[in-house]
Design a protein with these regions (language model features):
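Bacterial Sec-exported substrate-binding components of ABC uptake systems
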Residues: 2-14, 20-78, 177-209, 319-331
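A ligand-binding cleft/hinge motif common to bilobed small-molecule-binding domains
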Residues: 135-145, 262-280
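A short, structured surface patch at a secondary-structure boundary
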Residues: 69-124, 128-133, 139, 239
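His/Asp/Glu-enriched short active-site or ligand-binding loop at hydrolase and phosphoryl-transfer sites
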Residues: 221-247, 267, 296
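Extracytoplasmic substrate-binding proteins
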Residues: 60, 138-214, 240, 292-331
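Short secondary-structure boundary segments
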Residues: 74, 133-134, 210, 243, ...
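Short helix-initiation/N-cap motifs at beta->coil->alpha
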Residues: 56-58, 109-118, 156, 243-252
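Proline-aspartate-enriched helix->loop->beta-strand connector
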Residues: 67, 117-134, 251-268
Length: 331
């Protein structure tokens, strides 16, 4: 839960002379004491508002004011910052923060292999570092040990969690109004998809390929993942839900048994092609292959828990239920 605590110092003016005037009159003949000169009170300057928020790790984070020099350690955080108008407050990023285009101009101080250039971070003098669930805990502790304020943004379990992350960053950056506007817009778009899908009479079986390096055992997303949630929210059934872990390999034999009606390729950026997948041994019997329902998909839309998750939902809905969106071009 977010709290913005604004402490202001109240001005207290001592009125000793006024109170003294209510005392007993001076004795007759007694010398009249000289009046003390009045000294005008100097108003105190109130301190800057204190920004306070609780991060995903349960840590209460306090800033003297909205962060102005931010380092982001995850693409999702970077996209959230730019989406609420706080991109200009960033001074550093991880190497995978490549969206929007303006983010690429920022110095990269962390790699996707979990390596962090602490010297580069120190040189940037950030007043806030945004970590993520993928950030190694020892890195978070190292940064805090160096005196930096680190806010951990966890992966959302649902859309409400996504909206909460938007609002958290709005609080920390002084962009609360913009963040609320973005959260409302995302919520409205998710609602619109749900309303459109309310007339769906089927829930097609969907296989989403994360990595087909071993085509006999491609990696996919299992139960309890945000991708699983997105597929279901888009009116489909995730065939990976039969797995026992969130991310795992699934055998070709199991895929044939599941018989996906739609195959989405999240690994086309790494060379996987529709033609190559269609020619895989044993895959020709799948409904998706026979009906040519194999589609490339921008994995960044569903693997980065940022504002473009809703773009991913809209695109998934169109691919899974094209009959419901045939006359519309808004998604």
């Amino acid at each position: 839960m977010l709290h913005i605590i604004v402490r202001r110092v109240s001005l207290v003016v001592a009125l000793g002379l006024t109170l003294g005037a209510c005392g007993a009159p001076a004795a007759p003949g007694a010398p009249t004491p000289a009046a003390s000169p009045l000294v005008a009170a100097t108003p105190s300057v109130p301190p800057q508002p204190t920004v306070e928020a609780v991060d995903g790790a349960g840590q209460t984070i306090r800033l003297a004011g909205p962060a102005q020099r931010i380092v982001s350690l995850a693409p999702s955080n970077t996209e959230l910052l730019f989406a609420i108008g706080a991109g200009a407050q960033m001074v550093g990023r991880d190497e995978f923060s490549d969206y929007p285009e303006a983010a690429k101009a920022l110095p990269a101080i962390a790699t996707g292999m979990g390596k962090l250039n602490t010297e580069a971070v120190v040189a940037l003098e950030p007043d806030l570092i945004l970590a993520a669930e993928i950030t190694p805990p020892d890195q978070v502790e190292t940064l805090r040990g160096l005196g930096f304020t680190v806010f951990v943004v966890i992966n959302p379990d649902d859309f409400e969690g996504l909206y909460a992350n938007v609002l958290s960053l709005g609080t920390l950056t002084g962009r609360a109004t913009q963040a609320q506007g973005l959260a409302d817009e995302l919520r409205d778009r998710v609602t619109a998809v749900g309303q459109k899908l309310s007339s769906a009479t089927t829930s097609p079986r969907v296989f989403y390929e994360l990595d087909g390096t071993d085509p006999t055992k491609p990696w996919t997303s299992g139960p309890g993942t945000f991708l699983d949630l997105l597929i279901r929210a888009a009116g489909g059934t995730n065939v990976g839900a039969v797995l026992s872990t969130q991310f795992a390999q699934i055998s070709s034999e199991e895929l044939v048994r599941q018989d996906p009606q739609i195959i989405l390729l999240g690994d086309t950026a790494y060379g996987t092609t529709i033609e190559g997948v269609s020619a895989r041994a044993g895959w020709g019997t799948m409904t998706a292959i026979k009906q040519k329902a194999v589609h490339p998909f921008d994995d960044n839309l569903v693997s980065r828990p940022g504002p473009r998750m809703v773009d991913g939902l809209e695109q998934l809905a169109r691919l899974i239920h094209p009959e419901l969106f045939a006359q519309q071009s808004e998604y």
